[in-house]
Amino acid sequence: ALFIAYRRKNQRYRQIVRQQHELIQKEKTIKELYSQSEGGRKYTVSSLSDEKGQALFSEFEKLMRTEKIYRRSDITVDKIADRLETNRTYLSRAINENSGMSFSQYINSCRIDEARHILSETDNDIQIKALAYELGFATPETFSATFKRSIGMLPTKFRKEMRRMYNDARETN
């Protein structure tokens, strides 16, 4: 019975890893399409926010993508608001209305997305502790807990399963 439970757990881990791998591939496709489009997305007025809020969120997203400031451990909504020449309340509202997340949730989602990509690279042997600090987490424990909450498994297990999946794919080809 214990062996069967262990096998089921491993099968679920593999399923999660496959889903994450598919998401990474879809993200790459979307990024390619976005970079090929004329200026990215167009602004429209939505029921959730106005054009100014969407424009502010777009600037915020651009800052995240181009400068990867989410990697800074001392990042705050106040610092970003100053950088974007707005106030913290308006920035927080723009983030919440356009992403459905709070500032800290958005920052952590950027960090976890990058961690997912790095840990998916089979030739990357960065230590989890070093990765946690590189991505702006205060401690490796916070990183691991956030990663597990988001992805469903610890970063070490995710890396191991990604490598296993990669090796299985190579063996079948």
Give residue ranges: language-model regions.
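Selective detector of the "anchor" transmembrane alpha-helix that sits immediately C-terminal
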Residues: 1-7
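Membrane-proximal linker segments that couple transmembrane helices to downstream signaling/catalytic modules
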Residues: 8-109, 113-122, 146, 156, ...
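Sequence-specific DNA-binding recognition helix
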Residues: 122-158
